[in-house]
Amino acid sequence: MKIALLANPARGEINVLLATAYELIRLGHEVVFLTGSSFRNAIAEFKDEQNDKLLASRIQFSDLGTAKAFEDFTRGMQSHLKGLRKPPGDYSSMEICQIVALVTEQEFREAATLVRDRLLELDPDMIAVDALSPNLVTGCRMTGLPWMFTVPCSPSLTATRKSLFDPHPMGSRRQRTLMSALENLKLTIRETYGNAIKKDLYARRALLKKEFGLNSMGFNADSAIVPPLWKDRNCVGGIHFNTPGLWDSIRQPHQITFVGCGVTSDPENHSPSQAGTPISEIAGWSPLTKLSTSFDQSGQGERDLDVEWMDAAYAAGESVVYLNMGSMFLWTDDEVRACLRAFERLHRESGGKIKLLFKLNKPKRNPGSPGFTSPLNSPTAVATPKWDEKRPIDSRRPSGVSTLIMAEKLSEAIKNVKPRRKTDAEKGYSQFMLSEFEGLEYVRFTRWVHDQRRIYKHPALRVVIHHGGGNSFNEAVHYGLPQMILSQWFDTHEYAILAERFGIGLRSKHAPFVDEQDMFAKMLRLLRGPEAEKIQANAKIWSTRSRNAGGAPAAARLLETHALLHRQRKQARDPTPTAKTSLSVDTTEVATPTFTDTETSLSPKILSSAASTVTNP
């Protein structure tokens, strides 16, 4: 069968669809990606990674062009980064996300019409579209074909709010108290006012109802970041890439299936993590007990210097903390220094046993430029890191130097590091060169992570620090890793609150700012003592719950089921002999076990009887 997958080419949105496509082609289905031109190279790489001509032939790319409506909004977000970074409860953060995705009335009309026409031409058996891509969603709705949506963001964005005690997605008070109700009222009023005064939003709502003939979902809902898409008459359900139960928004629609982290069935994603050494072994900063077998690097392809650095740390009885703030975040010089000072103190406190793997994003252009409106910011292929940006940092301590002298040198090195900025327009964003940090033995900086799974599963890794993005949060949950969340904007604050509420991590006290003392204190709590042991135990429990949800394989099977149902209904309306023959072939294909010998295949009769429960809201 043919499955169409649509999303903005931003990695946060499309990564879960790539994982789902990985599963679909192994089920024997054809996958067609519909997205912007900038993702062409990534699709070519995805096909090459299959190492199988038959599997690669099942992956197709339908180029939607270079219009603003189809291009990666990562750079647009970066151009608004200073306004986007707000504390929990500040609605302006959500408003900026809305503005970045907004296009003019004519651009919206052209984009939705193009998507509709392309899909009708493809005539897929099922459509899956990213819920955060409004231009693509509208095109799907216009086809009249059955479709599904995928959700890579926080749970509250899909929750139904029936009272003021139900938390607003931007709410900082989420305990269903009187104060939280007042905050929710304030945020709702601000949201309604903002939706009413934006001309482009007004024009879009008019297009949906008058020109496109689509049903309204409500005044605020039609303009929401994630509308209640399950209310559309042709929507057959949604797939939420979050762990079931890991939420504080209790009214989740029954049409949405929570499948956990969007990881594939590749054994690399599911073999037992070696990071399960009891936290008590490092509670007193003692060296870790080595595992009976060395860390396996066989069959991993090209050399990975980050993993080699972690190997050396593990061999020396040292622990590693991994810091990755996602693809949109840009560091300032002060924030980089604050992190370095915090980890210098941790390194000293632990007797040299704690190290930091730091992924440092580099601005690819002027963050203050107007984004897509400038011809200078036309989309380019994803740049691969240069070799000199990945230079290894020696993990060995100089012999004959006392800890005190070394600490003084490290402090001096941090103070003396001076930023190198390309232009005055980029002032404020870190332009550090990686070579400037080679004297700091406790940290390795990297621009590019080759295989994040190998880092997550490494026995030296103890804690993950991230910005609270949906993928980062759920990957840490999947691999059972304690989290320190430096939440920055929009729904990242919700993930930070959830991590603390469910005891799987801690969050920054002064979000969105990076504070040295707060980071140092929180890392101590995560790395040693009874609280660290409790958090690690909770992380393991939620890891099991995430894996049980099924991930990308579950998403693929759900899409397959709906696709088969649609094809059967379509063939039932066409009583020709050809259709009957095709139906029998499809039934045979689906009856073949795919994942395990004991898995029960879905017969057409069973699927037909289940149709009413999954297609009707």
From Swiss-Prot:
Keywords: Glycosyltransferase, Transferase. Pathway: Secondary metabolite biosynthesis. InterPro entries: UDP-glycosyltransferase. One of its GO terms (molecular function) is UDP-glycosyltransferase activity. Residues 365-396, 567-617 are annotated as: Disordered. MELs not only have high potential as eco-friendly biosurfactants due to their excellent surface activity, but also have attracted considerable recent interest because of thei runique properties, including self-assembly, anti-tumor and cell differentiation induction activities, and moisturizing and hair-repairing properties. It is an enzyme of class 2 (transferase). Residues 371-381, 578-603 have a biased composition (Polar residues). Induction: Expression is induced when cells are grown in cultures containing vegetable oil as the carbon source. Residues 386-396 have a biased composition (Basic and acidic residues). Its EC number is 2.4.1.-. Disruption phenotype: Impairs the production of mannosylerythritol lipids (MELs). Leads to low-temperature sensitivity and affect the cell morphology by impairing formation of filamentous forms. PANTHER family: EG:EG0003.4 PROTEIN-RELATED, GLYCOSYLTRANSFERASE FAMILY 1 PROTEIN. Belongs to the UDP-glycosyltransferase family. Glycosyltransferase; part of the gene cluster that mediates the biosynthesis of mannosylerythritol lipids (MELs), surface-active substances that enhance the availability of water-insoluble substrates. This is Erythritol-mannosyl-transferase 1. It comes from Pseudozyma antarctica (strain T-34). The lineage of its organism: Eukaryota, Fungi, Dikarya, Basidiomycota, Ustilaginomycotina.
